[in-house]
Design a protein with these regions (language model features):
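Glycine-centered hinge/linker elements that transmit conformational signals in sensory
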Residues: 156-158, 202-238
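Extracytoplasmic/secreted proteins, especially bacterial periplasmic and envelope-associated proteins
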Residues: 20-27, 31, 47, 51, ...
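Conserved N-terminal structural module of periplasmic/extracytoplasmic solute-binding proteins
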Residues: 1-81, 88-97, 141, 145
Length: 261
């Protein structure tokens, strides 16, 4: 099927990707521009979460926005700041995405009238819940890969007892500083409670001051707020850019032994 002729038209896109991460996306955009004749303008920002709201409220939103967090898209959809996708996109997404209907559900939110509509589909999905380490460093120190949260805590304590630093953690991300901590907290929640508890938390049926949520936050704090557990001490966690945080794994000798993605 041939691409439509969009000569003379402009498509504006805003998203969180900056150089060099945006290079692959820009190559896809360039292919679309060549195929259709449209001019495509992409603007990246490390303050996307704030800027997209400001632009939408001012009536200056882009044609397309790349949301790192579906929750923000849901909030804006409920305020009437987003336009739903055509009805045909739901079946197309279910048919062409490996996870099928679940991807449709993740892009479906209530509009300002409370009606569920498809507002987005997933272009780029990041792998989470991985703990990175350098095998040679573990071998040299005599450490084994932990198989449970209890083993992970024990290994963390062992590394400290050996006079080393177990973790590199960085939460810095410009105006969005702090979001990597949400990955930790979400992961711990899913490892601590059944999926339905996580869903209640996401939909705000269970508030943030619920004892379960507080316990999960405190568990994360045991890693991030202990000066002996993190490279640079706990006060550095918020200022180290998340993109730079894994670098300590590769120093010789290593500045830390583990980094969570």
């Amino acid at each position: 099927e041939s691409a439509p002729d969009l000569s003379g038209q402009t498509v504006t896109i805003s998203g969180p990707w900056l150089q060099p991460e945006d290079e692959v996306f820009r190559s896809v955009v360039a292919y679309f521009a060549d195929a259709t004749g449209a001019e495509v303008i992409y603007t990246g920002s490390d303050s996307f979460e704030q800027q997209i709201v400001i632009d939408a409220e001012a009536g200056a939103a882009p044609n397309i926005a790349v949301f790192p967090q579906p929750g923000l898209a849901a909030d804006m959809a409920a305020r009437g700041l987003l336009y739903p996708l055509p009805d045909s996109m739901g079946p197309w997404t279910a048919e062409n995405y490996g996870a099928g209907e679940s991807w449709v559900d993740l892009g479906t939110y209530a509009d300002k009238d409370g009606n569920d509509q498809l507002f987005g589909f997933f272009y780029n999905v990041n792998v989470k819940s991985l703990v990175w380490y350098v095998p040679e460093n573990f071998e040299d120190a005599g450490y084994e890969v932990p198989g449970s949260m209890e083993d992970l805590r024990a290994l963390t304590e062992q590394i400290v007892a050996d006079g080393e630093v177990p973790w590199c953690i960085g939460l810095g991300s410009g105006a969005a500083t702090g979001w990597p901590a949400t990955d930790w907290v979400e992961d711990i929640m899913l490892r601590s409670y059944p999926p339905d508890v996580y869903d209640q938390w996401v939909t705000n049926e269970m508030p943030f001051n619920d004892p379960k949520v507080v316990a999960v936050l405190e568990t994360f704090g045991k890693f991030a707020k202990n000066d002996k557990f993190v490279e640079g001490g706990s006060k550095a966690v918020g200022s180290i850019d998340f993109r730079d945080s894994p670098k300590g794994l590769f120093d010789i000798p290593p500045k830390c032994y583990m980094h969570r993605q």
